[in-house]
Amino acid sequence: APFAGFGGNATKVYKGEASAPFIPSVFAVYKKDKWAFSGNFAVTGGGGKATFNEGLGSFESLVSVVPGMLVAAGNEMVDKGVLPINIFNGTNKYSVDSYMRGKQMIFGLQLGATYRITDYLSAFAGVRMNYVSNGYEGHIRNIEANIGGGEMVNVNKYFSDYAKQARTAADAYLAANDLANYAKYDAIAKEATKVAGLTADKELDCDQTGWGVTPILGLDFKMNKWNIGVKYEFNTKLNVENKTRIDNTGLFANGVNTPHDIPALLTVGVSYEILPVLRASVGYHHFFDTNARMADAKDPVTGQTMGKQHFIKQGTNEYLGGIEWDVCKWAQVSAGMQRTKYGVGDNYQSDMSFAVSSYSYGFGAGFDIAKNLKLNVAYFWTDYDKYTKETPNYGGTGIAGKDVFTRTNKVFGIGLDYKF
């Protein structure tokens, strides 16, 4: 396994560390007669920020085949009579300085109005302005290998120097009209230049921004002990534009626009008052992911490139349940859980963007600390599934490989409700 050439382990773990100590949100509503006007600002989507101090598997996989590539190139030059022996035999180790930091965040400013049609039925209409802010910064530097089984050396420098020496010799043989030796050293120079280019340092520093508007409609029905709410958010057409400062990877050309739609969302919630102090609720969310335009991905079987939405079998489904208990006049406690089920296929998943199904569990409490002021606190954690993706041609290396995606998430929240 190529990864064993760096640290001795065929399987490697790439851990992205993320920390968001403070994510603010603000919500306000003003009621007058049958009307209520509301607004809020919050981080409404995105995967947050993550730093991979050892890079990503898709990056290192290309470096891991360097020892084998050198041995194979040496064998080819021996077969062609360019080299008398394979001077690269014994190359079986490599090292690399790899790093990646990324962020994906969607900020939303929502405004809307609610009208009470009857004593039991209210309707809502609103819009949300979404601003997407993505960023990617990373590098692959100082690729080294134990060429010929010797000490670790910088591969780019080694072959750059090797190419210069071979080119000098080729030019000298050409001047002497020794075409046989010229052809030999010309081939060596070209091959060495190729390897030097493949092992050169790579840098990336790119931001992506874009915006779009989401229309929102909702209905709320309340009678006796029942309360039912339905909301539909329309699909948001949105592109993000690359603002690239450095990119010699060829992946993020400056000025290129990439589809980044926010999928339509249908939510349904039902609550029931079991006792005057005890309420239970259930909910369902469905994201229409297959109708949203997304960035391209390649089908490894057909080689065809198309939007990632074509690799989604079905939209995301979420199932929720919770219960709230009024412990006394000034305190409440609650608990709930959520099951999130994605319908993505292998071609959707990559180590730069992946989705794994999960269970979330949460607990909360509310305290009336003043006549018009309530303090809310909550804690929840998410237990993610593991998604395994097996590839016959891992990272374009020609070698079979496997990725296992998962993550962890823990959140503490605090909020204040003020009535005036």
Report the location of each language-model feature.
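A contiguous strand-loop segment
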Residues: K15, S25-V29
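Outer-membrane beta-barrel porins/channels
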Residues: I23, K31-F420
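Surface-exposed strand-loop-strand hairpins of Gram-negative outer-membrane beta-barrel proteins
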Residues: A1-S19
